Design a protein with these regions (language model features):
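Short alpha-helix boundary/capping motifs
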Residues: 1, 361, 459-460, 491, ...
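A short glycine-/small-residue-rich loop at the edge of a beta-strand within enzyme catalytic domains
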Residues: 104-111, 379, 415, 471
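Basic- and hydrophobic-enriched, low-structure N-terminal and domain-boundary segments
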Residues: 1-151, 155-163, 168-170, 486, ...
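General helical secondary-structure elements
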Residues: 4, 72, 247, 514, ...
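P-loop NTPase motor domains
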Residues: 24, 126, 133-436, 451, ...
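Conserved ATP-driven motor cores of ASCE-family P-loop NTPases powering translocation/secretion/packaging/pilus
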Residues: 428-530
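Low-complexity, polar-biased intrinsically disordered regions enriched in Pro/Ser/Thr/Gly
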Residues: 110-111, 126-132, 236-245, 267, ...
């Protein structure tokens, strides 16, 4: 038994032991009292009590000890029954116990070293470690940030956490959604100074972008299905519904074609440009069911060589459609893949430079630049996130025993604009153990519900940290006010009656009041924010001052000379270092092509 438990038991039962020992003297007095009748005993007891208690030591006679035991146990039983039947009062908390958090509340969740934390507010931080000294203080690193336009989501949350790039104990890779293309410019040099490898994918100007080929990350039949699901989920268009038959038919065709490219085509042809070329050659004859286009012949030949091929099996299911139906399916597929027909997009997806599967191996910062006014190419960003989560989870499980060596933090600004990430509600619940975290940044909570419907609550429930930077959207204010709870306040009412019989009185009562009502949240000071951390009282704090960050001096906000020229950075030539290793190949000895 621990010393703490022993001390607690002694403090609880020692008084009753003392009472029992004293009561042994009462037993001695009763034993010494003369008389056989009860009345005579009681009269004589008055004479023997002084003599019995004159000796401070307890009596050890069996009868006396029995009396002492009964008295001690009886007193303990009486106290227990009184406590059990007592009325339960919560003074000062009759209508609610809500209050604001204090520095003492957040202290167990913060790492001593500033660089080893996620910055939440000016005074509150969350340790990067998933294994704190006390396991009860473990929290996932998923964060939900809600703030209206101009509330400082980028300045007060994304930039400060991007500058947390100098931790030696907990190295971090970043994946940053950059709606305006400014974050990489302003913070890129700071990351380079701390040994980061920078990558950019730009859907606003593809000529200033690195290449991203979704097919480069296909390693199995499951990956083909995941890619097609991500593509179709984010190219639905607004307000589309109708018969699911067409979606299922399109899925069969796309899966079969992509599987064919992956398993049969040369690596340089495994891209969407080749996929479109295949679709363009798939003419269908409505009158002649025996007509075969070039793609039909490819699959027929493959079926003879590999009859159990995944691509062949899927294509045979597609070919069950009649000529007219098949033509409609082809038209739907062509419309869905129309963005890949643009030459810039073809070039940007021809091969891959992003190396998504290596984000957890070394310190890397990937900036995903997208338009916040035109969502035409945002589906590419969503596909990147979908593949990224799946690739990193698989790599953590298969190569690193379930935990990546470098934590990958996704700072997803304007989360509602990138489209739907398939299975996000499941991913946010499982990525924590793999050293991956997602920080969703929204203008209102209703944006999340509009995209993820009933799964929005599941996503929010897996965000252990939630920050409100300000806003006026009614649903957000209502939900936050209810989550903060009610506190108990004191109310005085003065009454003054005038007339022939004037009277004056004061009435005191307790009332329940929201910690912050909706109207108070709507006029929240621009420099304040509200932090909710699971299992802890909410905090009303100042927003983090970016200028106070130790790495602020490396940003272009501090000195315009620190601005990173992305185009120049992408076009730079790799420098050869003295310790680089090369393989020398004699070109004359190579076999002819």
């Amino acid at each position: 038994m621990s010393k703490k438990k022993l001390s607690k038991l002694l403090a609880l039962y020692l008084p009753y032991v003392v009472i029992g020992l004293l009561a042994t003297n009462l037993g001695e007095a009763w034993r010494l009292a003369a008389g056989k009748e009860l009345g005579d005993k009681i009269v004589s007891l008055m004479d023997t009590l002084p003599a019995a208690f004159s000796n401070p030591l307890p009596s050890l006679r069996p009868f006396d000890l029995f009396i002492g035991l009964c008295c001690g146990a009886g007193m303990r039983l009486a106290v227990y029954l009184k406590g059990k039947n007592a009325k339960k009062y919560r003074h000062g908390m009759e209508y609610g116990s809500a209050r604001w958090g204090t520095p003492k509340d957040i202290e167990p969740f913060m790492a001593p070293k500033f660089a080893d934390n996620i910055i939440l507010t000016k005074t509150e931080r969350l340790m990067m470690s998933n294994r704190p000294p006390d396991p009860k203080n473990a929290r996932n690193k998923n964060v939900l940030v809600v703030g209206g336009s101009g509330s400082g989501k980028t300045r007060f949350f994304i930039k400060p956490n991007l500058l947390q790039c100098d931790s030696k104990n907990f190295p971090v890779s970043f994946v940053v959604t950059d709606p305006k293309g400014s974050i990489g410019v302003e913070c890129g040099e700071a990351l380079l100074k701390h040994g980061y490898k920078l990558k950019f994918f730009n859907t606003i100007n593809f000529s200033k972008s690195m290449r991203y080929n979704p097919m480069a990350y296909i390693h199995s039949e499951k990956d083909v299905l995941k890619l097609v699901t991500a593509l179709m989920t984010n190219t639905k268009g607004e307000g589309q519904g109708g018969d699911p038959f067409w979606d299922k038919a399109e899925r069969l065709l796309l899966v079969s074609l992509i599987a064919y490219l992956h398993y049969e085509a040369p690596v340089e042809e495994q891209n969407f440009a080749t996929l479109l070329e295949m679709l363009n050659t798939m003419q269908v004859s409505e009158d002649d069911e025996t007509y075969q286009n070039p793609v039909d012949l490819l699959f027929e030949d493959l079926g003879k060589k590999k009859p159990k091929s995944f691509a062949v099996r899927q294509y045979k299911l597609y070919k069950l459609a009649a000529g007219k139906t098949a033509k409609s399916i082809l038209i739907s597929c062509g419309a869905r893949l129309a963005p890949f027909d643009i030459q810039e997009v073809r070039d940007a997806t021809m091969y891959d430079e992003l190396e998504l599967d290596k984000l957890g191996d070394r310190k890397t910062a990937l900036f995903l630049i997208m338009s916040d006014t035109d969502s035409t190419f945002n589906f590419l960003i969503s596909m990147i996130y979908t593949q990224l989560f799946n690739l990193l989870c698989d790599k953590a499980d298969d190569q690193y025993g379930g935990k990546l060596p470098v934590h990958v933090r996704c700072l997803i600004d304007e989360c509602a604009n990138i489209g739907q990430i398939p299975q996000l509600e499941k991913l946010v619940a499982t990525i924590r153990s793999r050293e991956i975290s997602a920080c969703l940044v929204l203008q209102t909570r209703s944006q999340l519900k509009a995209i993820y419907k009933d799964n929005a609550d599941t996503i929010v429930g897996n965000m252990d940290s939630q920050i409100f930077l300000g806003g006026s959207e009614p649903t957000t204010l209502k939900e936050l006010s209810e989550a903060l709870g009610k506190e108990t306040i004191d109310s005085y009412n003065n009454s003054d009656t005038r007339g022939n019989s004037p009277s004056y009185g004061t009435n005191y009562q307790k009332l329940g009041h929201e910690l912050m009502s909706r109207d108070e949240l709507a006029v929240l000071d621009g420099g304040k924010c509200i932090l909710q951390l699971r299992g802890v009282r909410p905090f009303l704090s100042d927003k983090y001052d970016l200028t106070q960050h130790p790495n602020y001096k490396y940003t272009s906000d501090y000195d315009p000379k620190n601005a990173l020229d992305i185009e120049k950075f992408l076009n730079r030539k790799e420098k050869i270092h003295p310790d680089d290793t090369f393989i020398m190949v004699d070109a004359d000895s190579l076999p002819p092509a």
